[in-house]
Amino acid sequence: MQSTDTKEKNKNIGGPVEHTPLMKQFFAAKSDYPDLLLFFRMGDFYELFYDDARKAARLLDITLTQRGSSGGAPIPMAGVPVHAYEGYLARLVALGESVAICEQIGDPALAKGLVERKVVRIVTPGTVTDEALLDERRDTLLMAISRSKQGYGLAWADLAGGRFLVNEVDSVDALEAEIARLEPAELLVPDEDNWPEFLRGRIGVRRRPPWLFDADSGRRQLLAFFKLHDLSGFGIDDKPCATAAAGALLGYVEETQKQRLPHLTSIAMEVASEAISMNAATRRHLELDTRVDGDTRNTLLGVLDSTVTPMGGRLLRRWLHRPLRLRDVLVQRHHAVASLIDSGADADVREAFRALGDLERILTRVALRSARPRDFSTLRDGLALLPKVRSILAPLDSPRLQTLHAELGEHDATAHLLISAVAEQPPLKLSDGGVIATGYDADLDELRRLSTNADQFLIDLEQRERASSGIATLKVGYNRVHGYYIEISKGQAEKAPLHYSRRQTLTNAERYITEELKSFEDKVLSARERSLSREKLLYEGLLDALGTELEGLKRCAGALSELDVLAGFAERAQALDWSQPELESAPCLRIERGRHPVVEAVRDQPFEPNDLDLHSDRRMLVITGPNMGGKSTYMRQNALIVLLAHIGSYVPASRAVIGPIDRILTRIGAGDDLARGQSTFMVEMAETSYILHHATPQSLVLMDEIGRGTSTYDGLALADAVARHLAHTNRCYTLFATHYFELTALADESHAGGASGIANVHLDAVEHGERLVFMHAVKDGPANRSFGLQVAALAGLPKAAVTQARRRLVELEQRGGESRSAQMAPTALDAPQQFGLFTAPSSAAQEALQALDPDELTPKQALEALYRLKALL
């Protein structure tokens, strides 16, 4: 389809179209990038025209105006100032847009006619490397997807961090899970039909010609890029689908970046079996770094992230979204955290890191030769910290910390080079001068002396000329247009010496030049120009020198990032009273006094800790209790404890013993998915189906209120069937919260001649009059009432409606007769209670107190109970 800009170019109004020279130049540049916004440099602004202008005005909320006409039609125009363009560019990139930047080539003042322009840079959401366009604590990823009969190949690159990885998955569900995990900023797919629904309408999707996603051509591209004869060293020789995706990605990067990418030195194959699998729904339900409502506050990452550096923050996010199953790796991380805590070294590391910049991304800019002067000073200061960090790690008894100590390396020569070459506080831009330190280069120092001494020369000259001419008001000055001058007022101009040559006439003064001043001007201006040229040459030399050290420096940055994460784990463990988890090879999941890390962090009152005990003969807990009683919190906290243990962190529990876990799967509530045309019940069943098809005996499954999206009997039947399937077919660890009390009978049934593997637990509440206090304590056995009407009253339902509901409940329970299980026999417990004439009603505090067993309480539990009792008074 022809773009509007092309139509504008081809308009024919009353005869042959003749565009202005400027518009011809614009259309020539735009024709090479029809799908990108074109930033067209015109003096101090980047201008956009036609469709680009209309789109930019809408997205950036800038003024849409006109710039005369061309080809017989008005020219829509919008623009952004050059000095502030990065902010606008960042907003466009965040919205999934790509931009081609067309610069003026050469000096416009010297151009004869139209100044030459050329596209010098392409910025896309997945290829940005500029600091101003990046989220410092989140990876910016470019991903490509290819597909075959066997499944999908994925390749993704973090150009700002220098990472390049691939993977293959066998289903649409697995593809969606990977995209949810990685959250690419830009996604390349073949321009074909029948792509999964979740990709349609996604920001940043780029459709590319299908022939670019070819395994053979991808292999050739990778071999040429890495200068290899085979790919066996990368482990992708037998991964044609992943190779096709990698080739498509690499081709796109080379096409858009227009330069070599020396910082991409390898490609890694991710092994799915090394990590705990979590689908998109699980990540959403557990609110790892984003809440269901889109808010990023009060999430697990928000509580856990105590990293000091941006690169440490990005690594933590990667770990959080890919918990490992590799026990040896995790044990080493736990041991490293323990060593940092026991020695107190975590505080020393974190204090040292406060002066550490984002070395990972700085090294990328060095490799791409786009590093700015202050990148050099930040790298210099970071390398200067290494001796101190190495001395902190040296005595610690931790295999992982000793490995990191070795990976830091010794970069004394590089540090010395930067210390001697880079000014203490360099300017923002190389063109400002003063980047290279005094004493580093004798020629540069001499040129600078000429410039520096200029001020004193001008003062001396002014005094001499005043004395020789007798004109006390004579001044020596400089402007960028006319250069150096001697200025004499109009009234004194007749006294100007004969050797003065008039340079400029002003309203109230005349300006002159002398041979001496002209000679000085040539010398000084030449010195300044030569000084900047010399400085640029030295700057390029620094880039060359650092380029030879990139591999070692990247390893160093990686070690610093991991050390930052581990020291952050140590700080969190001490600040939040977390404990070191124990990873067992036998199947079990035992958590003593576990807490929800996020809920505990945001609430003012002490959190009620709870236990969990699952093993081979006890694989499912049916959890009952009142709404708002804490069932969902209890389930989530156990999943989060398992997840934290598998990234190397300590956990919010007094003890956690965890056997092998391969998946965490959840079905915890959902709003209507109207955007995809799915009702709550449809979402519920789709997520349940996924769990039933994928859960294994090593999976942890959370099921919350299955069957609530349909009729009572349908819902009960489905909940019963799902619970039985999970317990007897999947045989996974399951926390099954339900409002169907009939399901509590499952624990009493036998299966295949043995125990059911199902146990009942409940959360209770204490009611006094119209008050209801949730105890949040998990106890053995089923609940005996739901407190639904009391919760409705707490939610603000009108009293008349609650009273009517109580009456109706009594009628329904009486009509139900003996049809329900004996344990859940109908009663009028939710009806108002009539106390005897001489019987004083017990208080909520009394009832809670009677439920306590002082002999079973630890001092901390007793204190927590005291807080709860006080709240009841």
Regions found by a protein language model. Give the residues of each.
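Charged catalytic and DNA/RNA-contacting regions of genome-maintenance
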Residues: 1-339, 347, 351-367, 371-463
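Amphipathic alpha-helical transducer elements in NTP-driven molecular machines
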Residues: 19-23, 39, 50, 79-89, ...
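Residue-level signature of catalytic and energy-coupling elements of molecular machines
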Residues: 26, 43, 92, 103, ...
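ATPase nucleotide-binding head domains, primarily ABC-like/P-loop NTPase cores
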Residues: 50-53, 239, 308, 318-319, ...
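Active-site phosphate-binding and catalytic loops of NTP-dependent enzymes
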Residues: 102, 125-134, 260, 394-400, ...
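Amphipathic heptad-repeat alpha-helical coiled-coil/stalk segments that mediate oligomerization
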Residues: 213-221, 228, 276-277, 282, ...
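Extended, charged coiled-coil "arm/hinge" scaffolds of SMC/Rad50-like chromosome-maintenance ATPases
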Residues: 506, 510-544
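C-terminal tails and terminal domains of large nucleic-acid-associated
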Residues: 842-873
